[in-house]
Regions:
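Membrane-proximal basic amphipathic "stem/tether" segments
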Residues: 4, 21, 324-330, 489-552
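Class I SAM-dependent methyltransferase Rossmann-like catalytic core
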Residues: 327-356
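A short glycine-rich, Lys/Arg-flanked "PGG" loop and its adjoining helix->strand segment in the class I
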Residues: 437-452
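C-terminal amphipathic helix plus adjacent low-complexity
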Residues: 269-338, 502-524
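Conserved acidic donor-binding segment of nucleotide-sugar-dependent glycosyltransferases
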Residues: 257-264, 274-278
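Class I SAM-dependent methyltransferase SAM/SAH-binding core
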Residues: 368-405
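Nucleotide-sugar donor-binding catalytic core of glycosyltransferases
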Residues: 1-62, 66-67, 71-88, 92-254, ...
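A short acidic, Gly/Pro-enriched loop at the edge of an enzyme's catalytic core
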Residues: 415-425
Length: 552
């Protein structure tokens, strides 16, 4: 019998403890967590530990005499939960990683720092699989991934009955889910009778099995829990189409086990089709459910985890075979460049979370690794533009790491159709100050009104000042972008961000380009976007223009 010690930062409900007598092949699990249920403590299934930093001796002193763990599993969830002295345990230590798309301490870079502080033997990613290459590049040991079914509670769908719903969505709508909320509103505005609510876990699963179509819209291009919950319940899953690096299409086949959409119109078309063809919808739902039960059930994934940790055996694609970027990491890494890439990715990932589609131009860039980093954001349309000679190296790189279908390469001069089309333009910080003015002249035609310029690189104070002066002459205001509902500034030390204020005489050229919704802007950025009609804001806008900082 395998004995597992779990050290968890969050509260664990009584339903997550198996208080019954174990079956022959069941693992014996002991959970150390803050405020465990008294029944679990009494049954010898839990050990209470404090929040924050504490010594592992608290756990070791309370281990049953017949229990020494075969492995210890932790979770990178609360960055302030710091058990110390794990080296006193001689068994393998495993760090479980998920939700890699937040900010602050729980950001991608924050999780990497947290994992590095423990130096675990294995690192298991169950959500945010597209970020595996960052963990490998950061030097974490034995990074692998497995489907997230072990983090959800088991459910067996009841006998099939008549469908109660045509299409449903069960989940959150908030300021953190702007894209999702807009998508749901789009469906309602177009006459789709979708049942939207947030219900308890079990009730949601029951509804999944009673609906002809279950809509999923992940938070930020990740394989979220709802994917596995819907398939476990036997519903037809209609989910946003993710990148190959997400791992979704290494597990399931589109059109066979689930269905996907890439745009609002495609979503409408597929809803209409499957409501008119319920037999095909049911066929896919049955196949998806069976695939999950046969290959990715909680028990099956738990056994895969134990087999790898304790016996060193793991089958493709879970050893990262699905993401070729992992195979082309240059060691030793340049730590400064790595941190810059991480921060740029986190900034653009946060903007990606809020928008249905983003068009980004990387102008004459030298950072091909950054280019392939960004390729896994499914709603980010990337164009890389450079001379024919420079394109050859980037084309080779994109083919090598298998992102060539996710990045459009264009040689200069850039020919645009339909006017200015890029909401964001990204450039590298010039090596020489004399090159800044020339660079701004080059990219000016590519930026529409309210478009954003990202200058990638760590700039000195003098360079920042000079760049800001020249940028203002080009109608670009320096801004700061913060994460939603926070004062956490994104991209600090990795890039400078500017927003384009188009001259009135040029406004007719840019009306077709959609504006980006960004998490949080400085006052100047809000003024330039016209996000507020308050008299104070209008007065401020006039004051700024009259000051000569912006040329009319």
């Amino acid at each position: 019998m395998i004995k597992e010690l779990r050290i968890i930062s969050g509260p664990v409900s009584i339903s997550q403890f198996n208080l019954n007598r174990l079956r022959e092949n069941d693992p014996q699990i002991l959970t150390a967590c803050p405020n465990p249920p008294p029944e679990a403590v009494k049954a010898g299934k839990a050990i209470p530990v404090p929040m924050g930093e504490f010594s592992i001796d608290i756990i070791l002193d309370k281990l049953p005499s017949d229990f020494y763990p075969d492995l210890v599993q932790m979770s990178a969830r609360n960055m302030h939960f710091m058990p110390r002295g794990l080296d006193k345990l001689t068994c393998p230590k495993v760090m479980k990683i998920g939700d890699t798309f937040h900010w602050g301490d729980e950001s991608l870079s924050g999780m990497i720092r947290y994992c590095q502080s423990f130096d675990c033997d294995y690192h298991w990613v169950y959500q945010g699989v597209q970020h595996l290459h960052f963990f490998v590049e950061a030097g974490l040991k034995n990074v692998f991934w497995l489907p997230g079914t072990p983090v959800i509670e088991h459910y067996v769908p009841q006998k099939k009955e008549a469908k109660s719903y045509d299409i449903i969505f069960r989940g959150s709508q908030s300021s953190l889910h702007v894209y999702r909320s807009n998508l749901l509103k789009f469906l309602q505005d177009n006459g789709v009778k979708i049942d939207i609510s947030r219900k308890p876990y079990l009730e949601s699963l029951e509804d999944y099995s009673k609906s002809r179509i279950v809509l999923n819209c992940g938070l930020n291009g990740d394989t979220n829990r709802r994917i596995f919950e819907v398939l476990m319940a036997g519903g037809l899953l209609l989910t946003d189409r993710l990148s190959p690096q997400s791992g979704l299409f290494s597990l399931f086949e589109e059109g066979v086990h689930l269905e996907c959409y890439d745009s609002e119109n495609e979503l409408l078309d597929k809803i209409e089709f499957y409501l008119k063809h319920p037999e095909q919808a049911e066929k896919i739902a049955i196949a998806g459910h069976q695939k999950l039960i046969d290959c990715y059930s909680q028990q099956a994934i738990q056994q895969k985890l134990y087999r790898y940790i304790l016996q060193g055996e793991i089958e493709p694609p879970f050893r990262l075979e699905h993401d070729t970027r992992v195979l082309h990491i240059n060691q030793p890494i340049d730590e400064k460049k790595f941190v810059i890439r991480l921060k740029i990715y986190e900034l653009i990932q946060e903007i990606h979370r809020l928008n249905s589609r983003i068009k980004l131009l990387y102008w004459k860039g030298r950072n091909k690794e950054l280019l392939s980093d960004l390729a896994d954001l499914p709603r980010l349309d990337i164009t890389y533009a450079n001379t024919t000679e420079a394109l050859a190296d980037v084309k080779t790189w994109c083919s090598k790491v298998e992102v060539k279908d996710q990045v459009q390469l264009q040689s200069l001069p850039l020919e645009l159709t339909g006017g200015k089309q890029f909401q964001m333009v990204m450039v590298d910080l010039p090596d020489k100050l004399l090159s800044i003015k020339e660079l701004l002249v080059e990219i000016e035609p590519q930026l529409p009104e309210s478009g954003f310029l990202l200058v990638v690189g760590k700039a000195t104070i003098f360079t920042k000042v000079m760049l800001s002066i020249l940028a203002r002459w080009s109608g670009l205001l320096p801004i700061r972008i913060c994460a939603a509902n926070s004062h956490h500034q994104l991209g600090v030390g990795a890039c400078l961000v500017y927003q384009k204020l188009t001259r009135p005489s040029q406004a007719h050229l840019v009306k077709s380009t959609p504006k980006l919704f960004v998490p949080k802007l400085s006052l100047k950025a809000k003024v330039s976007q016209g996000l507020s009609s308050l008299p104070l804001v209008n007065w401020t806008k006039t004051l700024i223009r009259n000051s000569g900082l912006i040329k009319n």
